[in-house]
Each structure stands twice: as structure tokens, then as C-alpha cells.
Amino acid sequence: AGLVKNLYMVNLVLNAEMLLSEIYAGHYLKSWEKACEAVDRIYRVDVPERADMIIASCGGYPKDMSLYQGTKTIDNVESGLKPGGTLVLLIEAREGGGPAEYFDWIQNWVSGTMEARLREHFTVPGYIFLLNCEQAKRYNILMLTSVAPETVAPMGLKAFSDIESLMKCAQPEGKKIYVIPNGSTVVPRVKGESL
């Protein structure tokens, strides 16, 4: 955008109900910054410290229709989770990974060629797949989902079809836990930390 002289931009900010909340227009950078401030004001929730565990729902269908869509919840809530912490993600994922090619990237991840291959043949689903794998390296991600455990195991994600097995693995006893019912529209942040 910076290459175009006198670029005028309109930024729309939606609320959690996906209704128009605010509009910012003008110089591309200034209107974008104002929109970012509005998003921060609308969606940020201050927390006193990072949690050992976050239990988050994507917010139901269509926000949890696939791992591709559910990534938004992981992105949002990780700012409130300690490194190495546990994320319990409630995501039906009735459409599996989402785009057909999402799980096609597994072999590249397992063989260690993911990043190089993605640089050669970039796709957004490939990028989201890589992002999910990298998140699974930073956090213990346990999902209550319809996705088969063996499908996501190579990514480092753990899938469960029943809450009892999941919670046994999560071991919540004695941990600082945040529960976020609509993780796709909530961004926890420790006061004073920047994203």
C-alpha cells in the first residue's frame, strides 16, 4: 500500500455478532491504525497473568467448522497462555482440516521440507497448516473434536472424542485456568504486554 501515492482506505470493524461497529477512512496507514485500536478496545480482555491452561471454544458453527477456521481461536487465546501451557480447544471440525489441501501438507511437515516447499508453492491453507504445527510445538494443544487422533498426531495436536479422556490428559488440578467461551472473538492480554 505504501507504494501508491495518496492511497485512501476504508476500514470496517465488526463486533462479535459480525455487525458493523466502526468505520475508519482516510490515509491508509492512519485509518488502519485507528481500526486496530478499535479492534483492541472491542475484543481485548485484560488478564492479571498468563494462564497454565486455557479452555476455549471457537464459538460454535461456523467458527469451529474446520481446523482452518479454528486457527483464529488459537491465534487469539495464545497471548493469555504461558509458553508450554495447555490449550483445551473445543472444536467440532465437521469439515476436518477445511480446504482439501490442508492435510496434504502433512508429508512435508513430517519430512522436514514444509517451510521450503511452502516458499516454493505458497498457499494460504499451507500457511495455516504450518502455523498450527508451530503452535503445537509451543503449547500442549488438546482438542475435543470429531477429527480422528491419528489425523492430527503428526502435527503435534492431540484429538479426543470425549471430555473425560481429554481432561485426564490435561491434568487441570492446581493450575491457573482461563475459560473462554468464544475464543474467536476474545483476545486475553496481560496488562502492559503488547501483542
Predicted region positions:
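Short acidic, glycine/serine/threonine-rich loops at helix termini
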Residues: L20-G26, S66-L67, E92, P99-F103, ...
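A short, acidic, amphipathic alpha-helical segment used as a generic capping/interface helix at domain edges
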Residues: K34-Y43, K72-N76, V124-C133, S161-Q171
